[in-house]
From Swiss-Prot:
Keyword entries, A-Z: Isoprene biosynthesis, Magnesium, Metal-binding, Transferase
Gene: atmG
CC cofactor: Mg(2+)
Positions of Mg(2+) 3 binding: D232
PROSITE patterns the record matches: POLYPRENYL_SYNTHASE_1, POLYPRENYL_SYNTHASE_2
Organism from which the protein derives: Aspergillus flavus
List of residues binding Mg(2+) 1: D108, D112
Protein name (record): Geranylgeranyl pyrophosphate synthase atmG
């Protein structure tokens, strides 16, 4: 107690402290699941602690209610046919990866000025940019907090390493776009290995902490991440379903150097048309259709298909080697079939 303070002030201070403590959830009470609003409310408080949690998580929960392909969960289930970790541990890791993936999508959509995600308006067009950034950052730390449930000290090292790699990859992707610098194919593959492969690796590394199986799966995981992103690049310029979910040829509007765009530019460096289209960030369908035809004229769609076929063949060879050590996984073949 501070001497010389009137008793009535001490009573007020004590009351304020109690109200503040009651207004926010403790770290142990935070959930990674969407929380429903409660009708009751403490006297003198405009909203309950769970109301505040719901507000903070609003953009995250908005996107979670419209699930995507859930390829990361399917990948984890496929690898678990080899790793054989308990279902409750798998679910914890899946929640961690799900939160991180959702957070990264929220930030990506802001950085890319996207209009649609999974066929609905992007979160920041509903909640605003500031609230969406805060919700995404909150989800990163909610995922980190959930690591405690694994009770594996090395999990924190894995978490930090892969999030750093993810942000390094994203940083280079943004730099190339904003400086209109076309990378080489090798630089692009390194970038997507960091960015897209990051959460794939994080999931499998955390699963390996829970498993007695010691085989090295990371080469296959890295390759699957590369295949997934290059396939995504192809569909962005080719798929009607992709256009419905994210917009027609969104990579061109974003000014993004995707796998096909990089090949097309590098196949004829003297022709600046595609670079100029990327610079414009055009939303005009006629301009984007012209760009797609130019990309086709440089053989970039055919080249992308050939590279994907080569990568998939390499992945199948890796699976064959792993099967000699850890047995058959139907889920892995389902993943490979999905990526065809």
């Amino acid at each position: 107690m501070i001497s010389g303070v009137p008793d009535r002030w001490k009573v007020v201070a004590s009351s304020l402290s109690s109200n503040l403590d009651a207004s926010y959830p403790t770290s142990s009470s935070l959930s990674t699941e969407p929380i429903d609003t409660r009708s009751s409310s403490p006297q003198g408080s405009a909203s309950t602690p769970v109301d505040k949690e719901k507000i903070i998580r609003g953009p995250v929960d908005y996107l979670l209610k419209c699930p995507g392909k859930d390829i990361r969960r399917k990948l984890m289930q496929a690898f678990n046919e080899w790793l054989r970790i308990p279902e409750d541990r798998l679910n914890i890791i899946a929640e961690i990866v799900g939160l991180l993936h959702t957070a990264s999508l929220l930030i990506d959509d802001i950085q890319d000025s996207s209009k649609l995600r999974r066929g609905i308006p992007v979160a920041h067009s509903i909640f605003g940019v500031a609230q969406t950034i805060n919700s995404a950052n909150y989800a990163y730390f909610a995922a980190q907090e959930k690591l405690r449930e694994l009770n594996r000290p090395k999990a924190y090292e894995i978490f930090t390493e892969e999030l750093l790699r993810l942000h390094r990859g994203q940083g280079m992707d943004l730099y190339w776009r904003d400086s209109l610098t076309c990378p080489t194919e090798e630089e692009y593959i390194e970038m997507i290995s960091n960015k897209t492969g990051g959460l794939f690796r994080l999931a499998i590394k955390l699963m390996q902490l829970e498993s007695e199986v010691t085989s090295d799966f990371l080469g296959l995981v890295d390759l699957l991440g590369v295949i997934f992103q290059i396939r995504d690049d192809y569909q962005n310029l080719q798929s009607d379903l992709y256009s419905k979910n994210k917009g027609f040829c969104e990579d061109l509007t974003e000014g993004k150097f995707s796998f096909l765009i990089i090949h097309s530019i590098n196949s004829n460096p003297g022709n600046q048309q595609l670079l100029n289209i990327l610079r414009q960030r055009s939303e005009e369908e006629s301009v984007k259709k012209y760009a797609v035809e130019y990309i086709r004229s440089t053989g970039s769609f055919a080249y992308c298909q050939d590279r994907l076929a080569s990568f998939l063949h390499e992945a199948k060879m890796m699976v064959n080697v792993l099967e000699d050590n850890v047995g058959f996984s139907k889920g892995i073949y389902d993943i490979l079939a999905f990526l065809l």
